[in-house]
Amino acid sequence: MRILLIEDDPQLGRATQMGLEQAGYAVDWVQSAESAHMAVRLHRYGCLLLDLALPGEDGMQALATLRRGGYDGAILIVTARDQIVDRVTGLDAGADDFIVKPFDLDELAARMRSACRRVAGRTHE
Protein backbone atom coordinates (compact mmCIF):
# COMPACT_ATOMS: atom_id res chain seq x y z
CA MET A 1 0.00 0.00 0.00
CA ARG A 2 1.22 3.49 -0.83
CA ILE A 3 0.97 5.99 2.02
CA LEU A 4 1.29 9.76 2.13
CA LEU A 5 2.82 11.01 5.37
CA ILE A 6 2.11 14.70 6.02
CA GLU A 7 4.42 15.67 8.89
CA ASP A 8 6.50 18.83 9.27
CA ASP A 9 8.82 17.55 12.03
CA PRO A 10 11.94 16.22 10.23
CA GLN A 11 12.97 13.76 12.95
CA LEU A 12 9.50 12.26 13.39
CA GLY A 13 8.87 12.26 9.65
CA ARG A 14 12.07 10.35 8.88
CA ALA A 15 11.51 7.87 11.71
CA THR A 16 7.90 7.20 10.70
CA GLN A 17 8.79 6.86 7.03
CA MET A 18 11.63 4.45 7.76
CA GLY A 19 9.55 2.37 10.18
CA LEU A 20 6.64 2.02 7.78
CA GLU A 21 8.95 1.23 4.86
CA GLN A 22 10.59 -1.52 6.95
CA ALA A 23 7.07 -2.88 7.53
CA GLY A 24 6.58 -3.11 3.76
CA TYR A 25 4.74 0.11 2.94
CA ALA A 26 5.68 2.57 0.20
CA VAL A 27 5.77 5.98 1.90
CA ASP A 28 5.87 9.43 0.34
CA TRP A 29 6.61 12.12 2.92
CA VAL A 30 5.72 15.81 2.58
CA GLN A 31 6.01 18.60 5.13
CA SER A 32 3.08 20.88 4.27
CA ALA A 33 -0.58 20.73 3.34
CA GLU A 34 0.16 22.41 0.02
CA SER A 35 2.61 19.64 -0.89
CA ALA A 36 0.05 17.05 0.22
CA HIS A 37 -2.62 18.47 -2.11
CA MET A 38 -0.18 18.28 -5.02
CA ALA A 39 0.85 14.70 -4.15
CA VAL A 40 -2.79 13.55 -3.93
CA ARG A 41 -3.44 15.00 -7.39
CA LEU A 42 -0.44 13.12 -8.81
CA HIS A 43 -0.66 9.73 -7.06
CA ARG A 44 -3.18 7.25 -5.66
CA TYR A 45 -2.70 6.63 -1.94
CA GLY A 46 -4.28 3.92 0.17
CA CYS A 47 -3.89 6.03 3.28
CA LEU A 48 -2.93 9.53 4.39
CA LEU A 49 -1.29 10.20 7.76
CA LEU A 50 -2.01 13.83 8.60
CA ASP A 51 -0.42 15.95 11.32
CA LEU A 52 -2.55 18.85 12.56
CA ALA A 53 0.23 21.34 13.37
CA LEU A 54 1.48 22.16 9.88
CA PRO A 55 2.98 25.40 8.56
CA GLY A 56 0.57 27.47 6.49
CA GLU A 57 -2.66 25.55 6.04
CA ASP A 58 -3.13 23.47 9.20
CA GLY A 59 -4.19 19.84 9.29
CA MET A 60 -7.88 20.49 9.96
CA GLN A 61 -8.05 22.85 6.98
CA ALA A 62 -6.16 20.32 4.86
CA LEU A 63 -8.58 17.57 5.88
CA ALA A 64 -11.57 19.66 4.84
CA THR A 65 -9.92 20.60 1.53
CA LEU A 66 -9.04 16.97 0.77
CA ARG A 67 -12.56 15.73 1.46
CA ARG A 68 -14.19 18.59 -0.49
CA GLY A 69 -11.82 17.83 -3.35
CA GLY A 70 -13.09 14.26 -3.53
CA TYR A 71 -10.35 12.32 -1.76
CA ASP A 72 -12.20 9.26 -0.47
CA GLY A 73 -9.31 7.18 0.86
CA ALA A 74 -8.44 6.64 4.51
CA ILE A 75 -7.15 9.67 6.43
CA LEU A 76 -5.67 9.18 9.88
CA ILE A 77 -4.86 12.21 11.98
CA VAL A 78 -1.55 11.72 13.79
CA THR A 79 -0.94 14.55 16.24
CA ALA A 80 0.30 15.58 19.66
CA ARG A 81 -3.05 17.26 20.32
CA ASP A 82 -4.84 15.03 22.80
CA GLN A 83 -7.92 17.06 23.70
CA ILE A 84 -11.32 15.47 23.17
CA VAL A 85 -12.47 18.53 21.21
CA ASP A 86 -9.64 17.97 18.68
CA ARG A 87 -10.54 14.29 18.31
CA VAL A 88 -14.24 15.00 17.85
CA THR A 89 -13.59 17.86 15.42
CA GLY A 90 -11.20 15.76 13.34
CA LEU A 91 -13.44 12.72 13.17
CA ASP A 92 -16.50 14.84 12.36
CA ALA A 93 -14.51 16.60 9.62
CA GLY A 94 -13.87 13.31 7.84
CA ALA A 95 -10.87 11.63 9.46
CA ASP A 96 -11.11 7.85 9.72
CA ASP A 97 -9.06 7.64 12.92
CA PHE A 98 -7.17 9.86 15.36
CA ILE A 99 -3.83 8.79 16.84
CA VAL A 100 -2.03 10.75 19.54
CA LYS A 101 1.77 11.13 19.49
CA PRO A 102 3.88 9.48 20.65
CA PHE A 103 2.58 6.31 19.03
CA ASP A 104 3.76 2.75 18.50
CA LEU A 105 4.47 1.90 14.84
CA ASP A 106 2.77 -1.50 15.14
CA GLU A 107 -0.41 0.16 16.42
CA LEU A 108 -0.22 2.82 13.69
CA ALA A 109 0.09 0.12 11.01
CA ALA A 110 -2.84 -1.82 12.51
CA ARG A 111 -5.01 1.31 12.56
CA MET A 112 -4.06 2.05 8.94
CA ARG A 113 -5.09 -1.46 7.88
CA SER A 114 -8.36 -1.14 9.80
CA ALA A 115 -9.18 2.25 8.27
CA CYS A 116 -8.40 0.97 4.78
CA ARG A 117 -10.72 -2.02 5.29
CA ARG A 118 -13.52 0.33 6.35
CA VAL A 119 -12.93 2.59 3.36
CA ALA A 120 -12.90 -0.41 1.01
CA GLY A 121 -16.24 -1.50 2.50
CA ARG A 122 -17.73 1.96 1.90
CA THR A 123 -16.75 1.94 -1.76
CA HIS A 124 -18.31 -1.49 -2.37
CA GLU A 125 -21.71 -0.75 -0.83
Q: Model features per residue range: what roles?
A:
Residues 1-123:
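N-terminal/domain-start alpha-helical segments
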